Amino acid sequence: ICCRICAMGPCRITPKAPRGICGCDAHGIVGRNYLKFTAGGAATHSDHGREICHTLYASAPDGAYKVKDPEKLIRIAKEWGVETEGKDIYDLAHEVAELALLEYGKPFGFQRWVQRAPKHTQEIWEREGITPRAIDREVSCSLHMSHMGCSSKPEALVRQSFRAGLGDGWGGSMCGTEFSDVLFGTPKPIDTEANLGVMVAENVNIVVHGHDPSLSEMICEYADDPEMIAYAKSVGAKGITISGVCCTSNEVAMRRGIPMA
């Protein structure tokens, strides 16, 4: 077990040296490291959700990104107490997107989405003091607690890792999931393929990957454009084949039937 978070280290814990230079033992070091990992994951997935919220805010009837599931948008708006009657769907999209973006840095209160959890689960979170607050606050708090000279109690560090994880799962990641459906359509059962054999030797092969479906959706959209297909043929290909790997592969597979490489 090794701690590398300050310039006086690294400190390696051994039977002869059970504590680091700051006095932290193996349990505290593992707790710090685990919390840092959790903060990194929460920041990554939540930032994906933030990008989707910004994309929803930029949606327009004549723009590249449109609202493809207005019914789901209206359901979410009502869930959040937003008036929907008589509103243009894009005005509503922008209002809901702004509220979602405020979930990342609001100074008071807890995440809106946690109200979806079963009541008894919410009571457990409240009792244990891990109901997630603003998404970015949980990440910031995690990095604060796991920095040199700060928390060394493993119980407190692991407790905050729970809170940061919930802030992601019931905050940033849920924003990404729900508003991706609003923008790109809610998935339905669909047939597709999975294998490296989905690539076509005579075609231009484009493999989409990553977390955020905003770019991959546009790639899929324009791969079917006659102008793009003509361009591919002008350089000797027979067409364009899109396939996917990683999380984005699932996004385009379940909405468009794009095969997984």
PLM-predicted stretches and their roles:
Residues I1-A261:
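Metallocofactor- and cofactor-centric catalytic cores in central/energy metabolism, strongly enriched
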